[in-house]
A protein has these predicted regions:
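A short acidic, helix-capping loop that chelates divalent metal ions and anchors anionic groups
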Residues: 93-98, 156-158, 187-191
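His/Asp/Glu-enriched short active-site or ligand-binding loop at hydrolase and phosphoryl-transfer sites
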Residues: 131, 137-173, 213-219
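Charged helix-capping and loop-helix junction motifs
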Residues: 103-107, 161-168, 194-201
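Active-site beta->alpha N-cap acidic-glycine motif
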Residues: 4-94, 102, 106-109, 113, ...
Length: 219
């Protein structure tokens, strides 16, 4: 089954499938988009929001529906503080293991959870693990959701990584217009990984300032 996977961060595959990894707007000339997957998390998300506020930065949160249902107040806070709330799915499951019916249900339930929490529908979708099945991609596009992957990632879910390594992975080769992937939750990764992410985020903002790069929403 895995041979049918689409490689999201391998440029030729992503580009051939029209899966964006970079910003398309005019604001991308001097900006990057920081995105967070897997939340909302009771500890990780508030800490990330505090750091974003301290740096007057904007970010996009790809949330998991089952976590939204548990903590709708956190999702409302994300939106109220000027960030974007987008869809990562209702559950964190690999699309290749799901039927078309299961995929449709996952996307519909995830969308409904966001709508109930913030009163608005998501416009972007990112699949768990960054992998679309052919059915999943077709369903997402049929619902007028735009896929968005990433150009740089910190691999911050790993158990033995460090804030410095996370920051270096993000910043190495980073250029204006790139979409950055980080995680504000540890539901589907190593325990308390979001703490390292928060520390890495401070390092990332220090370097973004030195490069005169702003942050924008991934819209």
């Amino acid at each position: 089954m895995i041979r049918h996977a689409f490689a999201p961060v391998h440029e030729p595959f992503a580009d051939s499938l029209a899966l964006p990894r970079r910003l398309e707007s005019a604001t991308a000339a001097r900006a990057v988009a920081i995105t967070f997957d897997d939340g909302p998390h009771p500890d990780g998300t508030p800490r990330v929001l505090e750091i974003l506020a301290a740096h007057r930065a904007q970010a996009t949160f790809f949330v998991i529906g089952e976590q939204v249902v548990r903590r709708p107040e956190l999702v409302r806070r994300i939106a109220e503080e000027g960030h974007s709330v987008q869809l990562h799915g209702y559950r964190h499951r690999l699309q290749l293991r799901l039927t078309a019916g299961q995929l449709r249900d996952d996307i519909e339930r995830g969308t409904a959870a966001i709508e109930d929490a913030v009163g608005a529908s998501p416009s972007l979708h990112r699949p768990p693990y960054g992998i679309y099945s052919s059915s999943g991609l077709e369903i997402v596009r049929a619902r007028h959701l735009r896929p968005l992957l990433w150009a740089r990632w910190g691999k911050d879910w790993r158990k033995f990584t460090t804030p410095d390594r996370i920051a270096r992975r993000v910043l190495s080769g980073l250029r204006a217009g790139d979409v950055i992937l980080l995680h504000d939750a540890d539901f589907y990764s190593s325990k308390r990984s979001h703490e390292r992410t928060a520390q890495a985020l401070e390092l990332i903002f220090t370097e973004l300032r030195s490069r005169e790069l702003d942050t924008v929403l991934a819209l």
